[in-house]
């Protein structure tokens, strides 16, 4: 379907709506307009698509020439929090609203069978990451509590399901009723209240330690309490910060781990080389446990992870923002207030001017770039204007270094302890696309058995 182009002598033009974008699927719209999307991005022209969160306010896809200005803009001009509230209807469904304090805390403080067995590994990853993340964010007491771990794993899915139901069933002018009448919204409030109850003993322990001479706890509860004064009567604010951090970490890290594993299973020759690297570093390590230095030395694994992220990104768009007030870019492009904007991940990840031979999965691509250009750049958690899978600017993922180490640890333990392969005749399943998201399909088995010495 052809695209009508609005011509204007200045960038203050009416941004063109992509024809055929009445569907909620970004993938479907891009397929219908595959040539023009590429031309718009290449020529630096913004365009609009239907917004799944609010069809009355189309989503603006910005060309990459605006990325530098966007990432350096003040929160009052371009806000990820404002985008999240709009996109997931957080204020209508009794969901926790993310705070800048929680963001600062993560950025500043954290950074046996012999036979083959069929296994769907996603929930294994999710539960492992939930416990690991909870140990760091909530401390040893709550990370060992099965109820807390279950809430951390299921809360995101409950929130997303409720958001989708409210978006589909309630017009914008009726959404103010949702917190009181929608079962999902009422359930989210109950979960938040239960989290506050579970958190209370940990809060009291840390509060007592802050008064006395006890050594401070090294977890996000302590870090949050250092940044903000919480009172017993409003512990839900503290638990909301915990839930917000879990929403931002557990399932995205689990999906990235699953996607990397799928790509490893498709390339057993890479798996063998990475296993050799892991064994070598473990043999040379002076510690019985993994150290950060050991993990940093896993350069082949790190390069494979980043190439997997480039080739199969978790998400079709990135650097998602919304502007609380009208904004004018330096070249004169004017964006009305409350406009949701983003940048396309695939187009940058597959740009031959940035990544030569982009349609080829090159496991050592980023290892060579580190060796030839800068060993401190191009690692998995690295962000730049050429690498935006973790976002850009002030709201690039603050926990990406922690997530990188979680993924490495899980893959190392799997590769050291188990042999893995696809069932006969199977390879990586097609990626799941919905709205602007893309995720590896978790509903497929892999074959696994204990590694024989």
Curated annotation (Swiss-Prot):
- Biological process (GO) annotations? secondary metabolic process
Q: What PROSITE patterns does the record point to?
A: CYTOCHROME_P450
Enumerate the residues binding heme.
Answer: 397
Q: Which SUPFAM superfamilies does the record associate with it? A: Cytochrome P450
Which InterPro entries does the entry link to? Cyt_P450, Cyt_P450_CS, Cyt_P450_E_grp-IV, Cyt_P450_sf
How this chain sits in the membrane, per its record, is: Single-pass membrane protein
Q: What is its main location?
A: membrane
GO CC annotation: membrane
What name appears for this protein in its UniProt entry? Cytochrome P450 monooxygenase CYP2
């Amino acid at each position: 379907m052809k695209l009508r182009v609005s011509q204007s002598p200045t960038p203050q033009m009416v941004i063109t709506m992509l024809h055929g974008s009445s569907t909620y699927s970004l993938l479907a719209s891009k397929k219908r307009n595959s040539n023009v999307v590429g031309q718009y991005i290449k020529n630096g022209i913004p365009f609009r698509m239907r917004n799944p969160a609010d069809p009355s306010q189309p989503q603006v896809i910005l060309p990459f020439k605006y990325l530098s200005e966007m990432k350096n803009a003040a929160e009052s001009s371009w806000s990820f929090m404002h985008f999240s509230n709009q996109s997931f209807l957080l204020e209508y469904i009794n969901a926790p609203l993310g705070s800048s304090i929680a963001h600062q805390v993560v950025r500043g403080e954290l950074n046996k069978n012999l036979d083959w067995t069929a296994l769907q590994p996603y929930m294994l990853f999710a539960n492992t990451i939930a416990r690991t993340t909870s140990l760091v964010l909530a401390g040893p007491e709550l990370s060992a509590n099965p109820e807390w771990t279950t809430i951390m794993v299921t809360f995101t899915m409950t929130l997303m399901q409720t958001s989708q139901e409210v978006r589909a069933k309630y017009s914008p002018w009726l959404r103010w009723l949702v917190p009181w009448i929608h079962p999902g919204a009422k359930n989210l409030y109950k979960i938040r209240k239960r989290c506050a109850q579970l958190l209370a003993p940990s809060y009291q322990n840390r509060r007592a330690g802050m008064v006395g001479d006890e050594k401070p706890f090294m977890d996000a509860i302590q870090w949050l309490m250092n940044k903000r004064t919480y009172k017993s009567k409003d512990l839900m604010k503290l638990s909301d910060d915990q839930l917000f951090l879990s929403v931002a970490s557990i399932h995205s890290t689990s999906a990235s781990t699953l996607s990397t594993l799928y790509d490893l299973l498709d390339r057993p020759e890479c798996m063998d080389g990475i296993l050799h690297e892991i064994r070598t570093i473990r043999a040379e390590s002076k510690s019985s446990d993994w150290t950060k230095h050991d993990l940093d030395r896993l350069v082949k694994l790190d390069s494979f992870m980043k190439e997997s992220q480039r080739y199969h990104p978790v998400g079709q768009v990135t650097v998602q923002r919304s502007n609380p007030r009208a904004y004018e870019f330096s070249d004169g492009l004017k964006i009305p207030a409350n406009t949701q904007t983003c940048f396309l991940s695939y187009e940058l990840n597959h740009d031959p001017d940035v990544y030569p031979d982009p349609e080829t999965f090159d496991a050592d691509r980023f290892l060579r770039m580190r060796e030839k250009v800068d060993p401190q750049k191009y690692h998995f958690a690295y962000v730049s204007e050429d690498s935006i899978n973790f976002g850009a600017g002030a709201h690039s993922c603050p926990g990406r270094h922690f997530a990188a180490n979680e993924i490495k640890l899980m893959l190392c333990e799997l590769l050291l302890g188990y042999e893995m392969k696809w069932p006969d005749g199977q390879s990586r399943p097609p990626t799941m696309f919905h709205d602007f998201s893309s995720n590896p399909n978790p509903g497929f088995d892999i074959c696994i058995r204990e590694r024989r010495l």
